[in-house]
Amino acid sequence: WYKSISRSIIIAALQYKKVDIFGFSTGGLLALLSTKKDYQEFVSVVCINAALHLNDLRIKTLLPAISFWNDIVKAFNSEKYTKEYVDNFPENIEVNYNKHYITSIEQLSLLMVKTRKILPKIKKPILIIQGKDDPVVNSSSAHEIFENIESRYKSLKIIEAKSHVIVNNKNTEELFQTILEFINKGEK
């Protein structure tokens, strides 16, 4: 994931004088992590429902147990007993996966840890947007990001929403207006 966004930033930096990085959910974490690359063209970050804390208790409780189980059965060369995924029941079945693969959840957990570590080093202007009643990402994520980044130009916007995918619901006009105002402010 991180290599993909890094390549995209390099390509954008070669094409444009100013690059704003946007990320939604896991992409929000990747956008934050991408600030490690301090390109001159990189002017700001917008993260939407950045997945620093998840509401799904299975991630905190079940994942470590499944990972431990998988390690044990692999140690005995019994890979056929490993659990590769947990079922997911997404709100947007047309765009979300119906399975959470254990390896991808482990990667997301690592990304959360790495992102937390770099928060105090983020100095770029940043807009943090969070859906108030997001069923996937705990709203404490947005507050933790806001409180821990060093940027002097930071803004936190909580949007009334009961869904995770707020980029295509009834509040999109408010969401996009907030983003546009943030970007326009940075261009002055």
PLM features per residue range, with description:
Residues Y101-I118:
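Active-site nucleophile elbow and catalytic-triad environment of alpha/beta-hydrolase enzymes
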Residues K3-D20:
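Conserved acidic catalytic loop of the alpha/beta-hydrolase fold
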Residues G23-G27, A31:
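Gly/Ala-rich beta-loop-alpha elbow adjacent to hydrolase catalytic centers
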Residues K124, N138-E147:
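Short alpha-helix in the alpha/beta-hydrolase fold that links the catalytic acid
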Residues I122, I128-Q130, D134:
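Short beta-strand/loop motif that positions the catalytic acidic residue
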Residues E160-K188:
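Catalytic active-site module of serine/aspartate enzymes centered on a nucleophile-bearing elbow/loop
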Residues H143, E147-V165:
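Catalytic histidine neighborhood in serine/cysteine hydrolases
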Residues V46-D56:
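Active-site nucleophile loop of the alpha/beta-hydrolase fold
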